Amino acid sequence: YLYAIDVDKKPRNNTRKAVCKNSTHANSYAIHVDQKPRNDTRKAACKSPKNAHRYAMLVDSKPRGDTRKAACKSPYYAYRYAILIDQKSRKDTRKAVCKSPYYAYWYAKEVDMCPHEETRKAACKDSLYAYLYTKEIDKCFREDTWMTVKGTEYEEKYKRILKKLVKEQII
């Protein structure tokens, strides 16, 4: 892509074809040389979750099914896609983030902004995120989160937060 910038000083089919063999180079070509979306550079960018996300943000400037599908191969990029590009929750991005307790918790907190069975189930794969899910999202006792934190370093914190939540409800 540097050849297109430094020598050709314009987009050409032969340089574009060459850069489309690498998702990062295709992304950079679309941003710096074509300066617009094209099906061939988008297809090449979608070989990588990172570059699909980057293409949607910087080239398409909007959500698309193909870039979202590629981003959803990574919980991290699925989360980023939902929060920065879609700017809303969707079944496909939620499913992708649920491969990670960390991103499931953050998706529930920052994207769904409410409890969801799928994100809670994923958060319950790790005692820290089960505890945080109870504290920040559910804000009530649930058997599944309790069973995850029971017998761990978060058990006492879980009990304390539940006592606090009960006191707040009474007052």
Task: State each model region's role.
Residues 1-171:
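Ankyrin repeat (ANK) tandem alpha-helical domains that serve as protein-protein interaction scaffolds
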